[in-house]
Amino acid sequence: VIVDSPLSSTSLWLTGPTRSGKTTRLVTEVRRWVELAWPDDLPQPVPPDSRQDAPPERHRERDTPRLFDRALTLSILGSETAKRQYRAGKLLLLTANSDNRQDLLDRLGEVTRQAYPLRATTPLGFFQAEVLLFWPLLIQQLHLRPQFPIRLRPETEQDLATRLWRSLGLSPSILPGSPNEARQVRHLLDLFQLAAFSGTPIEDIPAYLSRGLVSGGETGLAVSWSEVGALLQAWRSWCLARGLLTYGLIGELYGRYLLPLPAYRYHLHRRYRVVLADDVDDYPAIAAQLFQVMQQQGAVGVFTFNPEGAVRLGLGADPAAFTAVAQHCQVEPLPQPAVTSLGQTWAEPIVAMVQDPTMGEPLPEAIQSLQTVARSQLLRQTAEIIIQAVQAGEVEPQEIAVIAPGMDAIARYTLTEILTKQGLAVESLNEQRPLASLPRVRALLTLLALVYPGLGRLVDREGVAEMLVVLGRQIDPVRAGLITDHCFEPHPDTPRLLPVNAFPRWDRLGYAATTAYEQILHWLEDQQTQQAQRVLASPIVLLDRAIQTFLWQGNQPPYAQVAALRELMETAQHYWEVAARLQAETALLSPTPDTRLPTSDAVQVLANFIQLLRSGAVTANPYPVRQAGAAQSAVMLANVFQYRSSRRSHRWQFWLDAGSPRWLTGSDALFGAPLFLSTWSGGAWTTADQLALYEQRLERILRDLLGRTGERLFLCHSDLAVNGQEQMGPLLTLVNAALPVPMSATSELTSGS
């Protein structure tokens, strides 16, 4: 049990706009605590005297003397530093994403001099770790099968849910495999995740939908609300029976079952008596429940809140849910930005101009507009302004950010090509290109289909030719095409490559290309022999061998290629692990203690894996998500959501497609998200409500981005969008009011291009 104590009066709630010094103030408060030996004032656990909150009987006699004889423990520790560490327990540090976590962890490590154990994670990472750690409690409470859980990746979750619901008859009007089916499945899974993060029981989802939404419609669901509840509960039961965890299931297990348990709360307070939470405006509602429990137990906390943030509103975040947490803290407003930015002076006038175009006023010289007719002209002139400014020494590449409401592939490619040709590096923030868009990954998938029988329909001539070019460095595309035309033998079950002399004029290939092809051919034959003899353990081993033999070869590939290969291996390992678990459930797993599947099942799993990757569902985002070492000197390309999530700032910002309507309507909110916010009235969600939500989001975006702009802002607008339609977005008033970029800034380079 925990000593009854009033809610901590030393907890701080730091609120302020973008770059107002909230995180710095958090670090300063921790430094003050360390210098003043603050752990002396923290409430400590005492021996349990109530059976309700006590640990299980079998642990009580063993744990009580060691954990709760405080005087004996402190006397054994001896040094004052060790005593302070014992009183403080472990510090829980929560951040909105992993990049912010690492930055803040480095700063706190310097302040505490590594004297206190510090656990740094994200809210979702914390929920997942707690569910895994206390899985035995959940097994006992929910009467689950005792097996270690496996967390499903989102792409695997969608794949398995689609197959389950297809077998249950998702909807007769939905064509299996169609884009509409994928969208319907994604909507259902998102509803489960939103309900879990908001603390809403899964049984109440149909009632929420019936009160807030109109059934059907272009963006609605093709099933009735009662069917939504039945499908979600079937999916939930299916996952729990097999020990599979999704993000939504993790949120439900933690918020609904684990957090209310007295035994868990007991261990929670024993481990954490200090919580540091940065950017709580991006946390889900169940995180607010966690903080309230910790406050009731007497924990000390520092929380930072940005009213202009809420980047993940609509994706599970619920800023209004933390009002109850703030009520039990000492609120410290930080109204003024700690650094100079355009937002200090111009945030209010710009927001007013966007909300009411008739209130226009001249914008300063620091805000300029670049207007063209075609988008191709806009991209080129934007790049040329950046090149000229860097060459003139006005700004460094790492001080420039190009931000768009939707950074499409054409814009990324065009800007990257122009800037890199002038010697400027480009950083695409969380580009998330599908793995199947990379030639090396496509080559490895073709290789898998050639080694394992029964996958011939997944191999074509173009794929084989590309594989030869990628794996055989001495084979150019022309020779690869000749080899494929004469030496590739298609077959539904056993496609194969023939010896080079099957090409009558093989002498035209040359020695280098012939040698490279024969090396690939002999390697394939060796792997096929091992696979037939059941020596090849799994496709994961084959992928690793292929990478080591053909792609690595002792050199160091670029980071982007390494990240793609790592993500491919991580995805393959995860997919095979899940397949082995599912096969074990149906008693089809071989009796050997490894993860080998029966041959027919392994081929089917491999076919599904190849099709999943080729569908573009998997992107290259392995762990860690950023490159180690010093930040490179590069121009940043990002969309609005990615840039705001990264919490970065730049001297110069270029707002690409400033006239696009996506600044207002380009929300990434999940289906039905407003119904699971604590601010929802409980009535029908109307078009007026949605418009008000869009306008509030646009205001937050403007204030946030202006607060991250140091000196110059360029509003880049083309009359025609990439699809040829005229752009009439909400920021067009700003584009027309801003001073145009001087013609000398672009005329010289444009005339020479």
Language-model segments: which ranges?
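Coupling/switch/interface segments within P-loop NTPase motor domains and analogous charged loops
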Residues: 142-237, 504-537
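ATPase/helicase motor core of nucleic-acid motors
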Residues: 394-531
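C-terminal accessory regions
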Residues: 657-736
